[in-house]
Each structure stands twice: as structure tokens, then as C-alpha cells.
Swiss-Prot record:
HAMAP family: KdsB (MF_00057). GO terms for biological process: CMP-keto-3-deoxy-D-manno-octulosonic acid biosynthetic process; lipopolysaccharide biosynthetic process. Belongs to the KdsB family. SUPFAM superfamilies: Nucleotide-diphospho-sugar transferases (SSF53448). InterPro entries: Cytidylyl_trans (IPR003329), KdsB (IPR004528), Nucleotide-diphossugar_trans (IPR029044). This is 3-deoxy-manno-octulosonate cytidylyltransferase. Its EC number is 2.7.7.38. It comes from Chlamydia felis (strain Fe/C-56). It is found in: Cytoplasm.
Length: 254
């Protein structure tokens, strides 16, 4: 059977796998009556800049669920090492005309579509930028100190200098701002496949942060500072935090 292909130019991809080490079956976890992946999908589908939003999975249960709630879903290989590889495979197989690709982690059920729109517009307005990702300021000591939250530093023009699970920069003055990285990336097509073709690097492996691979190979990532900062789901116990957040923000478009 011939695979369906789409003519979309600007595509949001939600990579979703079943076999997460930290939380098996996470995409289908129930959050106040809807699955994690459905909440993420419905939020991003409100985007005013994307032509198509699609879930990319390696699991039939996830695909069936997405199709049941009316979403678009494509099947990818179980051999993909990370979400970016899964995104690239989905684009290569199903979206031959895609020019701007947004890789949106499927564990961000509270992510507002306006964050995605900010990234897409940045690429549209700035032809010299190849990859763009958001960050939000934080003063929360737990977020700063935990290695589960990624921090970033960037120059005065927004060019990323480094990403780390450690607190960066080192704080000698209380007024020094700390920025949390939000795990969403907007790529130009060539930049996405350049990443896929590049070799793993020492810092990306040491920090377990795939974006460092781009920097270590001499590429650049632009940072867009956004106001929106919301909880993600990494472990089963994070579900309760997300439900509390959604309850407190019930007037928002969730």
C-alpha cells in the first residue's frame, strides 16, 4: 500500500513513542479526562502559522488513539534514537514539500500554540536563522538546581552559547537572569537533515542534550525569549502537577 504524502509547507510534528524508560505508555496517560498526547495536539492545532500538525509514532496503540480523537498520525521506525530523528523520518517520508518543521515534544500538554507561532515567525522574518528554540526566565530555585530542567545562555543577539543541566551562568549577583530552555525546535528543512547526518558529539552525550550536537558541529541556534512557562510530563508523578496547573489556568485554551 502506497504511503500518503502531504503538500504542507509548515509542519508541526509531535514525536510520541510507547517505550519510554521513565514512563512507559506516557502519550496515553490520562490528564483530567484527555490523554497527554491529545492535550498537546489540540493546543498546537490552534497555531495560526502551521499548515499541518501530526503525531509521529512507532506504536499502533498511539496511532489508533490519535485517529480516534480526530488527529493526524504517521507511523515511523522503532529504531529512531530520539524525537528529532523521528521528526526527520516523518518529514522525509510524508512531507516532501515541508520547508519549516517544528519539533514539539509530546510531553508538553500545557504548551501554548503562541510559542510555536513565535518560532515560525522568527524563521519567516530572519532568513539567516536555521534553528530557533524558546526559553523563559525563571527565579525558581528548584528549576535552577535540578538536572531535569535545562538551562541556556545566549549572546546579546539571541545566539545560543550553551545548554546545560547544571545552573548556568554561575550566579555571583542575585540579579543575574536564568533562562530555562523549552524543548521545542523550529528547523529549516536543510538544518533538520544536517543534524540527522551529523555525528554524535562529546558534550551532547555528556549532558544528554541533542541540541549541543548542533553547536559542537559549528551550527547555531537562535533563542526566542517567551513569557509562557508550563510544566511538562517526565515521570508519572508529574501528572498531578500538570492537573493542578490546568485547573488553575482553566480560563486558558487548554
Amino acid at each position: 500500500m502506497e504511503e500518503q504524502v502531504f503538500a504542507s509547507k509548515k509542519v508541526g510534528v509531535l514525536p510520541a513513542r510507547w517505550g519510554s524508560v521513565r514512563f512507559t505508555g506516557k502519550p496515553l496517560a490520562n490528564i483530567l479526562g484527555k490523554s497527554l498526547i491529545q492535550r498537546t495536539y489540540e493546543n498546537i492545532s490552534q497555531s495560526t502559522t502551521l499548515d499541518k500538525v501530526v503525531v509521529a509514532t512507532d506504536n499502533q496503540r498511539i496511532m489508533d488513539h490519535v485517529l480516534d480523537f480526530g488527529g493526524d498520525c504517521v507511523m515511523t521506525s522503532p529504531e529512531c534514537a530520539n524525537g528529532t530523528e523521528r521528526t526527520a523520518e516523518a518529514i522525509s517520508r510524508y512531507f516532501p514539500e515541508a520547508e519549516i518543521i517544528v519539533n514539539i515534544q509530546g510531553d508538553e500538554p500545557c504548551l501554548q500554540h503562541t510559542v510555536v507561532d513565535t518560532l515560525v515567525r522568527k524563521l519567516e522574518e530572519s532568513p539567516e536563522i536555521q534553528v530557533v528554540t524558546p526559553a523563559a526566565k525563571t527565579t525558581d530555585s528548584h528549576e535552577i538546581l535540578t538536572n531535569q530542567k535545562v538551562k541556556c545562555v545566549f549572546d546579546k543577539n539571541g545566539k545560543a552559547l550553551y545548554f546545560s543541566r547544571s545552573p548556568i551562568p554561575h550566579i555571583l549577583k542575585k540579579e543575574t537572569p536564568i533562562y530555562l530552555h523549552i524543548g521545542v525546535y523550529a528547523f529549516r528543512r536543510n538544518a533538520l537533515f544536517s543534524y540527522i547526518e551529523s555525528t554524535p558529539t562529546s558534550l551532547s552525550q555528556a549532558e544528554d542534550l541533542e541540541q549541543l550536537r548542533i553547536l559542537e558541529h559549528g551550527g547555531s541556534i537562535h533563542i526566542c525569549v517567551v513569557e509562557a512557562k508550563s510544566p511538562s510530563v517526565d515521570y508519572p508523578e508529574d501528572i498531578n502537577k500538570v492537573e493542578k496547573y490546568l485547573t488553575c489556568h482553566s480560563s486558558a485554551s487548554f
